Each structure stands twice: as C-alpha cells, then as structure tokens.
C-alpha cells in the first residue's frame, strides 16, 4: 500500500507502508481533492531496485521484482487519487549497457508483468501508452506492448505511460 504524504506544488511523496487505507486516509484524499492539491501528472524515475536488493543480500532481480509490486501500488494509488497521467521511466537507453543477462531478465520481467496486469489495467479503466524506441525491444515484448495498448486504448481513467528505451536525446530526435 502506498501512502500519500504531501504535494507542495513541485513534488509528491509516495512511500510504501504496511497498512491498509483508513477512514483518515480517505478523508485526507477528499481534503486534497477539494483543495486542488492532486497533481494532474506524476512522473517516476524507476531507480534503485538493484541497490535495494543488494542492501538486503538478495539478487538484483529480486529488487526488480519488488519494483513491479511497487508499480502496481503506484498505479492503484494514482487511480484512486484521481491523478490523470502517470509516466514511469522504466528502462532508459543507458540500461542497455547493463550485463546482457540482467537486460534479458528485465525484458522477461516486463513481458510477464504485462501479461499479468493488462486485464487489471483494463478493468480499472487505465489506458496504457509507451514512449521511447520500442523497436529496440525484443519482438515478443513489442507485440505484448502493442496488444496491451490496443486493449486499454479506449479507457478514460488514468493514462499510464511507460518510457522504454528512452532518453532525452530520443525525445529531441522524435519531436
């Protein structure tokens, strides 16, 4: 469960917590909405999963798997709060420089997550989009992304954008 901490006009703090939402949490959400403090767009740079795992004596992939769980929580929380757009910077062009076995594991993890989560996204009215050089990804992953985006394309709730094989340079060349 992610807990909403505070939005000060520049940044929002989301932290992972062990408890379920309480009546006080729901009242706080209503207060924030009424005050206009819910941001329209939140962007998350997904970083630190490997360090998280290393600090716990776990393999790097365990950190990435925990990252998938965190993404599920973030998407759910943003949808509940009424955030309109969520962008996840999930795999930059720099990530291609990681060891090949780690990149392969990350691609498989993303493929599995898409297969497991697309129905949930659709049910929760989330529209999935991608930005970045998706053609650089493995063809099986490209196909799954295309199918997930098509399946959720007419949803009108939260728009979830995955930035994959993405960089500022890519954005400039594609503008």
Give the ranges of each region predicted by the language model.
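Flexible, compositionally biased loop and terminal segments
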Residues: 2-175
């Amino acid at each position: 469960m992610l807990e909403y901490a505070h939005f000060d006009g520049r940044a929002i703090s989301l932290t992972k917590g062990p408890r379920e939402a309480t009546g006080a949490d729901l009242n706080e959400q209503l207060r924030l909405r009424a005050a206009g403090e819910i941001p329209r767009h939140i962007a998350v740079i997904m970083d630190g999963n490997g360090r998280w795992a290393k600090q716990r004596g776990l393999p790097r992939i365990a950190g990435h798997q925990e990252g998938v769980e965190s993404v599920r929580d973030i998407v759910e929380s943003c949808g509940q709060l009424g955030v309109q757009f969520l962008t996840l910077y999930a795999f930059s062009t720099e990530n291609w420089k990681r060891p090949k076995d780690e990149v392969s594991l990350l691609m498989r993890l993303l493929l599995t997550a898409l297969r497991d989560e697309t129905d949930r996204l659709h049910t929760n009215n989330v529209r999935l989009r991608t930005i970045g050089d998706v053609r650089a990804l493995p063809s099986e992953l490209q196909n799954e992304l295309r199918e997930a985006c098509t399946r959720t394309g007419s949803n009108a709730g939260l728009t979830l954008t995955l930035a994959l094989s993405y960089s500022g340079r890519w954005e400039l060349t594609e503008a």
